[in-house]
């Protein structure tokens, strides 16, 4: 909203014109979200401790996790607040893509908050019943998917971008809604599954968001979009502001979530961040790129699916424990080693994903 104010003030002082530059707004969006997180963190942690809102730890998990019992959770509130304020300050409020992401971010944040509340306040270890969680995730995702389809149904915004093939961009039509639904819900739950160690989920989220910031900038630039053979989408540029806000809020949260964590994000953070990343990927027409850049989330999810499937079909487990990060813990890897190695893999996958944009 400050952009509109700056457009008015530029009549009195030309220096306010700097607010019209996307790169400037992207930087201040990141810094705004970062500083809000850093400021809010100690206050939120103290408040959560006062209310005794602490993490519930599984009895069948690694023994090293027992010391985490009681650590404040629902820290994702600071992430959501930081992102929302930063985006509202620095993005153009008239941009429909921005509102689609905020709708998912806040909607999934509410679902996650209810789940966390039932777990840590009501002492219900199951939290929100799975079918109700999935129901509300589905309703919110479908509402966003139909909205996004109505915005771009007559443009290249509903084409499917296939990696490595510059001339293959099939028009999805209404299948766009179905794809958007699965990507948003799937990514939300994938990030949620990954959030099992201190800082494990937030840093890959930051890497992927940073990667999508570059993609959004290119997609919203007619010349770079043509150069990379990706669809030019005139609303996409403002998603840079959203992505950099996620990066800033994520780094601010990591300040308190790094090993040993002072606070956990909880479902209020992981479901919302995953949903936001999925929505950004759909809006940019880069669902396949999300699979590559978010490979850590994909592998974590597949490990759970394979573990459950193998146990039901063969009565045997593939991993010592799923998601797969617990498998490595039980093999004797110290928690920081698991975390940092997953970070390195995530960074490599983001770079590989960005490289595929040119390898066509």
Curated annotation (Swiss-Prot):
Q: What is its EC number?
A: 2.7.8.13
Kindly list the residue ranges recorded as spanning the membrane: 27-47, 72-92, 94-114, 132-152, 168-188, 199-219, 236-256, 263-283, 288-308, 338-358
Q: Which cofactor does it need?
A: Mg(2+)
Catalysed conversion reaction = UDP-N-acetyl-alpha-D-muramoyl-L-alanyl-gamma-D-glutamyl-meso-2,6-diaminopimeloyl-D-alanyl-D-alanine + di-trans,octa-cis-undecaprenyl phosphate = di-trans,octa-cis-undecaprenyl diphospho-N-acetyl-alpha-D-muramoyl-L-alanyl-D-glutamyl-meso-2,6-diaminopimeloyl-D-alanyl-D-alanine + UMP
Q: In which pathway does it act?
A: Cell wall biogenesis; peptidoglycan biosynthesis
- In which broad location class does this protein mainly occur, judging by the first location in its UniProt entry? membrane
Report keywords, A-Z: Cell cycle, Cell division, Cell inner membrane, Cell membrane, Cell shape, Cell wall biogenesis/degradation, Magnesium, Membrane, Metal-binding, Peptidoglycan synthesis, Transferase, Transmembrane, Transmembrane helix
This entry's Gene Ontology molecular function terms read:
metal ion binding; phospho-N-acetylmuramoyl-pentapeptide-transferase activity; UDP-N-acetylmuramoyl-L-alanyl-D-glutamyl-meso-2,6-diaminopimelyl-D-alanyl-D-alanine:undecaprenyl-phosphate transferase activity
Topology of the protein relative to the lipid bilayer = Multi-pass membrane protein
GO CC annotation: plasma membrane
Q: Which residues form the signal peptide?
A: none
Q: Which InterPro entries match?
A: Glycosyl_transferase_4, PNAcMuramoyl-5peptid_Trfase, PNAcMuramoyl-5peptid_Trfase_CS
Instruction: Quote the subcellular location field of this record.
Output: Cell inner membrane
Q: Name one GO biological process term.
A: cell wall organization
Would I find Cytoplasm among this entry's keywords? no
Q: What class of enzyme is it?
A: transferase
By sequence similarity, the record places it as follows:
Belongs to the glycosyltransferase 4 family. MraY subfamily.
The entry's function note states: Catalyzes the initial step of the lipid cycle reactions in the biosynthesis of the cell wall peptidoglycan: transfers peptidoglycan precursor phospho-MurNAc-pentapeptide from UDP-MurNAc-pentapeptide onto the lipid carrier undecaprenyl phosphate, yielding undecaprenyl-pyrophosphoryl-MurNAc-pentapeptide, known as lipid I.
Task: Tell me the PANTHER family matching this sequence.
Answer: PHOSPHO-N-ACETYLMURAMOYL-PENTAPEPTIDE-TRANSFERASE (PTHR22926), PHOSPHO-N-ACETYLMURAMOYL-PENTAPEPTIDE-TRANSFERASE HOMOLOG (PTHR22926:SF5)
* Descriptive protein name: Phospho-N-acetylmuramoyl-pentapeptide-transferase
Organism from which the protein derives:
Yersinia pestis
């Amino acid at each position: 909203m400050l952009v509109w104010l700056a457009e008015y003030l530029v009549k009195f002082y030309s220096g306010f014109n700097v607010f019209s530059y996307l790169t400037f707004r992207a930087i201040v969006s990141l810094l705004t979200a970062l500083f809000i997180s850093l400021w809010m963190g100690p206050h939120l942690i103290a408040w959560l401790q006062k209310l005794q809102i602490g993490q519930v730890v599984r009895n069948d998990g690694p023994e090293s996790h027992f010391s985490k019992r009681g650590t404040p959770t629902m820290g994702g509130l600071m992430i959501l607040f930081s992102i929302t304020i930063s985006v509202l300050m620095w993005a153009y409020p008239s941009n429909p893509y921005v509102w689609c992401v905020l709708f998912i971010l806040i909607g999934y944040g509410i679902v996650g908050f209810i789940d966390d509340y039932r777990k840590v306040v009501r002492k219900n270890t199951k939290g929100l019943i799975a079918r109700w969680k999935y129901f509300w995730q589905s309703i919110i995702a479908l509402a966003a998917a139909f909205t996004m389809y109505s915005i771009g149904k007559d443009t290249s915004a509903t084409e499917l971008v296939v990696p490595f093939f510059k001339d293959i961009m099939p028009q999805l039509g209404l299948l766009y809604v179905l794809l958007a639904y699965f990507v948003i819900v799937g990514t939300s739950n994938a990030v949620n599954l990954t959030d099992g160690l201190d800082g494990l989920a937030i840093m890959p989220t930051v890497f992927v968001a940073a990667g999508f910031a570059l993609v959004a900038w290119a997609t919203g630039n007619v010349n770079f979009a043509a150069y990379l053979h990706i669809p030019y989408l005139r609303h996409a540029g403002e998603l840079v502001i959203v992505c950099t806000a996620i990066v800033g809020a994520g780094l601010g949260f990591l300040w308190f979530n790094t090993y040993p964590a002072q606070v956990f994000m909880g479902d209020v953070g992981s479901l919302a961040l995953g949903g936001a990343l999925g929505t950004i990927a759909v809006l940019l027409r880069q669902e396949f790129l999300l699979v590559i850049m978010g490979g850590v989330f994909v592998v974590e999810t597949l490990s759970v699916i394979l573990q459950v499937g193998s146990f039901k079909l063969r009565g045997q487990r593939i991993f010592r424990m799923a998601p797969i990060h617990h498998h490595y813990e039980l093999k004797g890897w110290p928690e920081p080693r698991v975390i940092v190695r997953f970070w390195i893999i995530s960074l490599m996958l983001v770079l590989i994903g960005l490289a595929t944009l040119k390898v066509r």
